[in-house]
Structures are given as structure tokens and as C-alpha cells.
Design a protein with these regions (language model features):
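N-terminal Rossmann-like dinucleotide-binding module
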Residues: 1-57
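Short acidic-hydrophobic, aromatic-tinged amphipathic segments that line or gate anion-handling sites
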Residues: 59-73
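Contiguous beta-strand/loop segments that form the cofactor/metal-binding neighborhood of enzyme cores
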Residues: 195, 202-304, 332-339, 364
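C-terminal helix-rich "cap/oligomerization" subdomain common to oxidoreductases
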Residues: 38, 53-59, 82-90, 334-380
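Conserved acidic residues
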Residues: 35, 84, 172
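Short amphipathic alpha-helix with an adjacent loop that forms part of the alpha/beta core around
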Residues: 70-83
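Beta-strand-loop-alpha-helix segment that lines the small-molecule cofactor/substrate pocket
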Residues: 85, 91-152
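Predominantly a Rossmann-like dinucleotide-binding segment in NAD(P)-dependent oxidoreductases
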Residues: 7-9, 151-249, 372
Length: 380
């Protein structure tokens, strides 16, 4: 295996549950052999390797070589060292296009045809057109490709999908709410739209993806969105951990609220509200799916996921909870199984094409909200 990126998504952080390497170790055990770790900051790569070599997973990293970039690594690959899968947790600014320096998918398709590739979300920070170009280029050239929309792998998400399928439900409406606790969100790049692309594309993308997963394809031209901008009266954030006025250019500050509605291709209606408002650490997240006779309510997706189901004939809600559910592990295990056995490709729940559609959806919401802001400013 090859791991791209020595940062928190691949090697863990006290801030959250993400840590792909530890799930790979759990899935593969002694069969895991990481031949390369690619990161432009060699000290970071060496640091995580020292930690791994001092752990019970030492044998998986004993011979891992460090490379500054994909070009340097690919120049060394032989038939004996050709990887089965490349695990990409590097920032999205360095992938998702056909432009040199941001074309890691193209490089892998050309140099290692048939290799499996896992990518974190969002697929890029480039344009939607660039991402669609990549989608077309890698089709049929790479092996299994999985993108890290891990909330699809929650057992409550799968139960919700099963209920829709088993009962042949025609979804009427999807309503998603994503309210973040911002007090400890100190990374200034997140608050800068020129770097993060804003909270819908960078963060609410998970719920936009679930909205597509449960409701179907969205008519992008139907999207209407409003936002609460940093300069509007209710936008003050009393617990912001840094001086936004001194650190973030006014035109790049993120909206405090984004509220969007849309039509699905099926005719159903969808909505999303992303809010930067809560103090403390825990987010409020909830997504409702309605069909004739049914209310399906997925709550607290990040902390303690629960699915509440109301069915025809009973006004009381059924409650579904699953102990020790690790969607990150299910995501990793599904990818590895698909790489090792082509008959298991259905275990991958988000393909590159699927993730590209979610990316286009999030950009359409941002553009719609910006158009609304611009229109209000033009009004006399």
C-alpha cells in the first residue's frame, strides 16, 4: 500500500475519530505493507513513521520509504513494489484536476493502471468542470475508486436505505440540518473561503451527499439559497477563537448560515440548513426523509447515531441504535475487499462519479447563495 499525506486524516488526531492507518492495520493485520509514505514535509512523515515503528504495527511500516511527491515515488516503482491500493488523504487542493501539480488521479491512471484508489472528500478544490474531466479520464483506467463519505457507511444510514428499498418507498421530501459548534474550530483556513471553499463545500458536503443518497439526483438549476453573511446584524460569534477582522479578508469570510431548497429529478423536494452557532464541542445534525406513511429521522450522525422510524399504522417511533459502529472501518474494509475481490465492488458506497456529483451539488448551493447576496446588494 501507498499512503499519500502524513496528516491527521491518515494518522489520527485528538480532535476526532479519523485515522485511516489504524483501520487499515485492523483490517489487514500483518498483511499490511506500506511501501511508501508521500508528504512534502519530510519531518511530518518521519514523525508518524517513528510512532508506527514503536507500535504493535511496526512490521507494516518497517520498510516504508518517504517521498516528497507522487513524481518522486512513481519513478521508483517496480513490478515487485507495485502497490495494490493508494490511500490519498492529502489536501483536496492537490487533486481533482488535469492540471499539473493537481492531477494525482491522472498520474496514477497513467503510471499504475488498474490500481485501487481511496480519496478523501471533497474530491477537489478545483472547478466542477475540472472534476468532471478527471471523472471521465479515470473511468476504466483505475481499479476500484472509493471516496470518503463515511456517513453512508453508518448502520443507521444503511437501515434507512433498506427501509426505503424493502417498502418500495417513493421519497417525497428530505430535510437536512447541520449546526456546528465553532468554539474550538481554530484553524483559520476553514474560515477563509479562498482556502476551504466555504462550509457547505468543505463540511456540509457530508449531508449534501446523504441528501442525494436517500433522495436521488438533484436538479441543480432548481436550487434556491439564502445566507447570513458576516456583515449582517445577527452574524456575531462571541466565542470565535481569533480576530477574524485582522486575519481573514472581508470578501473571504464564511457565511454564518446557508439555507437551500431544491427539487429532485423525481419531483421530490429537498432542503439543507448549515449553521455556525453552537458553543462547546458537539454538533447538532439531523436529516429527515418522508414518504407516504413514513417518517425516517437520522439524528446525531457524528456522536451517537440513532434512526427513528414511524410507519403506517403506528404513531409511535421505532428506535434503531447500533453499539460500536465505526463507519470509518466499514469504509476501509469495503475498499480493501473490493480491491482483493472484484465481486465485492458493491461494498464501495461512493464512487468517484458519485462524489463528483455531490461536489457539483455543493458548488451549486454556494453559487445560488452568492447570487442571492449579489441581487440584494443591487436592489435600490
Amino acid at each position: 500500500r501507498v499512503i499519500v499525506g502524513a496528516g491527521q486524516i491518515n494518522f489520527g488526531s485528538p480532535e476526532g475519530p479519523w485515522n485511516h492507518s489504524i483501520r487499515l492495520e485492523r483490517k489487514l493485520g500483518p498483511r499490511l505493507h506500506v511501501v511508501a509514505l508521500i508528504d512534502p514535509v519530510r519531518e511530518n512523515a518521519e514523525k508518524v513513521l517513528r510512532q508506527k515503528r514503536a507500535s504493535s504495527a511496526m512490521s507494516s511500516y518497517r520498510d516504508t520509504a518517504v517521498y516528497p511527491d507522487m513524481h518522486a515515488y512513481l519513478a521508483t516503482v517496480t513490478s515487485d513494489t507495485r502497490p495494490h491500493v493508494v490511500w490519498i488523504g492529502s489536501p483536496p487542493a492537490f487533486r481533482g484536476s488535469m492540471h499539473e501539480g493537481c492531477d494525482i488521479e491522472k498520474m496514477l491512471a497513467d503510471a499504475l493502471p488498474g490500481v485501487g484508489v481511496f480519496l478523501e472528500k471533497p474530491v477537489s478544490t478545483s472547478s466542477v468542470g475540472d472534476v468532471m474531466d478527471v471523472d471521465r479520464y479515470i473511468d476504466g483506467k483505475l481499479g476500484p475508486v472509493s471516496v470518503g463519505y463515511m456517513l453512508r457507511y453508518l448502520r443507521v444510514s444503511q437501515k434507512l436505505k433498506q427501509i426505503i428499498s424493502d417498502n418500495r418507498l417513493r421519497v417525497m421530501a428530505v430535510n437536512a440540518r447541520y449546526v456546528i459548534a465553532y468554539e474550538h474550530l481554530t484553524k483559520q483556513w476553514w474560515w477563509n473561503k479562498s482556502q476551504s471553499l466555504g462550509p457547505v463545500i468543505e463540511q456540509a458536503t457530508h449531508f449534501c451527499d446523504l441528501a442525494r443518497y436517500f433522495g436521488g439526483e438533484v436538479e441543480l438549476d432548481s436550487i434556491i439559497a439564502h445566507s447570513l453573511e458576516h456583515f449582517e446584524s445577527p452574524s456575531g460569534l462571541s466565542k470565535l477563537a481569533f480576530d477574524e477582522e485582522a486575519c481573514i479578508p472581508a470578501e473571504e469570510r464564511v457565511p454564518r448560515v446557508t439555507s437551500a431548497t431544491w427539487k429532485y429529478e423525481s419531483g421530490a423536494v429537498g432542503s439543507l440548513m448549515h449553521v455556525i452557532a453552537l458553543h462547546g464541542r458537539d454538533f447538532f445534525t439531523e436529516i429527515d426523509v418522508f414518504a407516504d406513511g413514513y417518517s425516517l429521522r437520522l439524528c446525531d450522525a457524528y456522536n451517537a447515531p440513532v434512526l427513528y422510524v414511524r410507519r403506517p399504522g403506528d404513531d409511535r417511533e421505532e428506535v434503531y441504535k447500533y453499539d460500536d459502529d465505526d463507519p470509518f472501518f466499514s469504509e476501509v474494509a469495503g475498499m480493501i475487499d473490493a480491491v482483493e475481490d472484484p465481486s465485492q465492488r458493491h461494498r464501495i458506497l461512493t464512487s468517484y462519479d458519485d462524489a463528483a456529483r455531490t461536489y457539483a451539488f455543493t458548488w451549486a448551493i454556494r453559487r445560488a447563495s452568492e447570487a442571492c447576496v449579489a441581487a440584494r446588494h443591487r436592489s435600490p
